[in-house]
């Protein structure tokens, strides 16, 4: 079993987006710690299994971040289940999890399931609109969410998601200072080695996604953060 606490860098692939064989090979051979498959729009059983089968040729951990029940399937090393803490719709707190347990509860290996305390911070992102997230958050709000995740819910991961824009470093720093047990994931707008280095100095793990589809060379440079210690 892989130890996710050792992961510093994850590439996130969207099953609804095209990636060439050459670019996928470069991503999977880049020394990233893991590949995560996940997205908001058009995540289907067919495109998830197609992308999974392409990535499975490489010897690295493979994660499915669950956005709907229809695209859940066996074959992944881990299943990340987001609970969107700042959603105004209870479905995105535990509704998806409830349906997953009703459908697959009898066969789930809970050692493979990682629950993420998700906080969506970009009001203009698809994920914010889809999850009906209240993104008007102060530093104090984020600190309270961090305390909730770390001390009360005791979730293994807190994911600060800016989805498409580079986040407020001071707010991410404030969150990190309240997490003593929970692993901090950061994702959103990382498009350069400098940004990757800046966020990797704060977060335990950075997630790099959109830049893969815009500039593969810049995406690959973000893996260099693994050469330095946090």
UniProtKB/Swiss-Prot annotation:
GO terms for molecular function: heptaprenylglyceryl phosphate synthase activity; magnesium ion binding; prenyltransferase activity. Its cofactor is Mg(2+). It comes from the Bacteria. The keyword Phosphoprotein does not apply. One of its GO terms (biological process) is glycerophospholipid biosynthetic process. Sn-glycerol 1-phosphate binds at residues 12, 159-164, 189, 209-210. Mg(2+) binds at residues 14, 40. InterPro entries: GGGP/HepGP_synthase_I, GGGP/HepGP_synthase_sf, GGGP_HepGP_synthase. CDD domains: PcrB_like. Its EC number is 2.5.1.n9. Prenyltransferase that catalyzes in vivo the transfer of the heptaprenyl moiety of heptaprenyl pyrophosphate (HepPP; 35 carbon atoms) to the C3 hydroxyl of sn-glycerol-1-phosphate (G1P), producing heptaprenylglyceryl phosphate (HepGP). This reaction is an ether-bond-formation step in the biosynthesis of archaea-type G1P-based membrane lipids found in Bacillales. To a much lesser extent, is also able to use geranylgeranyl diphosphate (GGPP; C20) as the prenyl donor. Belongs to the GGGP/HepGP synthase family. Group I subfamily. Homodimer. This is Heptaprenylglyceryl phosphate synthase. It comes from Staphylococcus aureus (strain NCTC 8325 / PS 47).
